[in-house]
Amino acid sequence: MFFSFACPVCASYDQTFSRWAKTLPPGWSAEFLPVAVPDKGNYIAARAFFAVQDADPSRLAAFMSAAYTLIQQNGMTMEDPGTWSRAVAMADVQGFNEAWHNVTQQRLERAFAKLLTYGVDATPSMVISGKYVITPDDVSGDSALYMNLANGMISKVMQER
C-alpha cells in the first residue's frame, strides 16, 4: 500500500486500510510503504515512518493517524522536524530517536525503487500480489467499491494459484 502523508485521500482511507489489513486471508498481509520520492518532505516522512516501524511497530497505526492529523488538519509540513516529533509523542512511540539514526539511505532507495517498479503514479495505491495496481481513481473515488475491488483482486489471485 503506497501512501503519502501529504495526500488527503490517503488520510481519508487511513482507518479503513488499518481495519481492512486485519481481515486479510491467511497468508496475506498488507505492507504500508511511504512514497519515498527524492524531495525533502517525502524523504523525511519516509524516514520517520521506517523509524517508527523499527522502533515500536505496535504504535505504527497510531503514528500514522497522528501524522495525518498534524499535516492534513493542523497544517504542519512534512519538512518540519516538529511534525514528526509531535506525531511520535501523540502516538507514544518508544525508541524513535535511535531508530531514526539507523534508517539507511538504501532503505529509502528501495522504497523508491518499488514505487518505480510497480509504476505507482497516484496515492493511495495498492499493489496486489505484485501484479495488480489499483487506486481509488479506478472506481471514481468510491471507497466502499475500492475496498470491494481490493478484496476481489485478492480472490482472483488466490484462484489463479
Where are these regions (language model features)?
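Hydrophobic alpha-helix position signal
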Residues: 52, 85-88, 115
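Structural alpha/beta surface segment adjacent to cysteine/selenocysteine redox centers
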Residues: 5, 11-82, 152, 156-157
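Alpha-helix C-terminal capping segments
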Residues: 21-24, 87-91
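Short pre-active-site segment immediately N-terminal to redox-active cysteine/selenocysteine motifs
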Residues: 3-6, 122
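C-terminal cap of thioredoxin/glutaredoxin-like
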Residues: 90-161
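Soluble periplasmic/extracytoplasmic beta-strand elements of cell-envelope proteins
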Residues: 1, 29-33, 125-127
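Short glycine-/small-residue-rich flexible loop motifs, especially phosphate/cofactor-binding loops
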Residues: 18, 85, 112
